[in-house]
């Protein structure tokens, strides 16, 4: 993705239902240090993760901060979905736990309007000047109209109530997604996200989401193969489904179309292995 575009070497660390696993993160840092590979930063989406939909538990957050401090690794906390918990819950930010050790990123594209490519960064003071220079070289200048529109919206409208409206809408669409998965893809496994945009679906053994995608597109439905979210080529047995844009009826129809492709591929696997 974006990191590879800048020729970064990306190394992944495992997660589970409670997010990043502290012990595994420590082991990853230690292994890389032993190999003489300097870790530049630790990037994470701690809340309603894309694509897994999980949140790092409150218990793990201070542990992760201490591990990163101990190994002198900056935390890049990307939090575009943090206000989209369906029950209104918010989590302790890494930034609040270690202000001088965290670069915090936010965006209006997920909570107001995706067409406004406006975001913000809260950086340690020592990084601010370098961050401004990097931003100027990468994007020259964000759209003035977009920034002005968002500024007016935040100052003159009830944006908190609008986010609450979005939460209710996304919860309903999440429910439609889960019901459709139960009805059409009972042979698969999935999480039930408590916020954000995505459901992470595991396919039955023998199926390949990346290989299956062209057949899904032919059936007028699409998803993102799990391989897009791994640094090492894994994830062929997973697909990311998004419920943020389509309405409940379209979500159900989309899952039904995916199920047709899955069932056809399962038949081929049973016949030919």
Locate the predicted segments by residue:
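PLP-dependent class I/II
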Residues: 1-273
């Amino acid at each position: 993705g974006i990191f590879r575009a800048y020729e970064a070497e990306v190394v992944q660390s495992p997660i589970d239902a409670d997010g990043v696993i502290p012990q595994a993160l420590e082991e990853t840092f230690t292994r890389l240090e032993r190999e003489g590979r300097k870790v530049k930063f630790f990037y994470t989406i701690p809340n309603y993760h894309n694509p897994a939909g999980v949140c790092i538990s409150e218990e793990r957050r201070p542990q992760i901060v201490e591990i990163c401090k101990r190994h002198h690794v900056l935390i890049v906390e990307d939090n575009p979905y943090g206000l989209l918990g369906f029950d209104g819950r918010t989590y302790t930010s890494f930034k609040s736990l270690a202000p001088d050790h965290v670069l915090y990123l936010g965006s209006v594209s997920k909570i107001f309007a995706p067409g406004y490519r406006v975001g913000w960064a809260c950086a340690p003071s020592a990084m601010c000047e370098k961050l401004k220079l990097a931003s100027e070289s990468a994007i020259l200048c964000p759209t003035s109209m977009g920034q002005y529109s968002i500024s007016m919206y935040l100052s003159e409208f009830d944006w908190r109530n609008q986010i609450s409206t979005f939460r209710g809408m996304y919860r309903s669409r999440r429910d439609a997604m889960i019901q459709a998965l139960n009805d059409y893809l009972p042979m698969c496994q999935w999480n039930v996200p408590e916020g954000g945009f995505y459901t992470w679906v595991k396919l039955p053994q023998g199926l390949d989401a990346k290989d299956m995608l062209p057949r899904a597109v032919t059936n007028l439905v699409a998803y993102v193969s799990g391989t897009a979210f791994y640094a090492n080529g894994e994830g062929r047995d997973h697909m990311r489904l998004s419920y943020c844009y389509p309405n409940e009826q379209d979500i159900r129809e989309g899952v039904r179309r995916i199920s047709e492709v899955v069932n056809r591929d399962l038949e081929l696997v049973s016949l030919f292995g």
